[in-house]
């Protein structure tokens, strides 16, 4: 691996994995706040903050609304002292939620479907959907202005782990274009956080990359984005927030306050420029410059990545099950109400 390409991988891993593990004590607020404190201020005293541990599947600009809610102080104003931990994989996030190590998980909702089908007595329920498109891109070694999905037939592609949303959405797109996944040599042995290193090391003719990996590869002339999985797959419930049913019953006020803060983050990214959003979340991605963050946000905004609200609709859930079924990863189709609630997201809009 050349020094330059090695730097690409190091930068990618730092940007995807080095999230803050706690919220700064003082964060300036520049937007209107919802009155949603968990424990209101009394007699002019500072409100008591509720500690909440959130385990995220990865640390990526793809999840900008959440980081805006942190950096603009929305969680703190909602009465929440947020401890953000990066789990590096949906399976690890789910393990943290089930064990009680995390109060809330942020991951692909397919993981909650798997858990429900295993017959969990304390199911993990999705209560807020953040992204409505896939956040990854197909990267080739050379520029391809006239790329067609059929170009992948017979080629080596670094995909993602079997059963994960990146891999399943990729296979879904292939099938939508009349291509059987077996016609493509898909490497499912590499974790999505390591595909960039494998690609720069010479593996694969193509790789499926999240941001900032895709942009970093382009900046170093090591790869070129030829297709957006988010655009070509259509609207997909890619990532959502979830918690154990028992936690939600015990702390409905915390879940509501958390959702209210997230909704403010959603409204921010949908009403501000890429430059303004980049400036807001810069400290979450200190290993990269604001210009690069802006480029990535503009790419995500252009493809309508973020919802206007956090409501996880039944239509979206049905599409998720269809994708899982198409990938051969669904034993049975759980009922919508068993793994999704829209109560908190709908109230956050009021």
Each model region followed by its residue ranges:
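Single conserved hydrophobic/aromatic residue that forms the stacking wall/gate
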Residues: 1-12
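Secondary-structure end/capping motifs
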Residues: 249-331
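Short, glycine-/small- and polar/acidic-enriched structural segments
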Residues: 27-29, 33-35, 39-179, 186-189, ...
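Pocket-lining segment of extracytoplasmic ligand-binding domains
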Residues: 111, 142, 193-285
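Bacterial signal peptide processing site
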Residues: 19-21
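Short, solvent-exposed loop/beta-turn-alpha elements that line the ligand-binding surface or hinge
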Residues: 77, 150, 231-233, 303-312
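Conserved C-terminal helix/tail region of periplasmic/extracytoplasmic solute-binding proteins
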Residues: 318-350
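C-terminal motif of bacterial Sec signal peptides marking the signal peptidase cleavage site
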Residues: 14-17
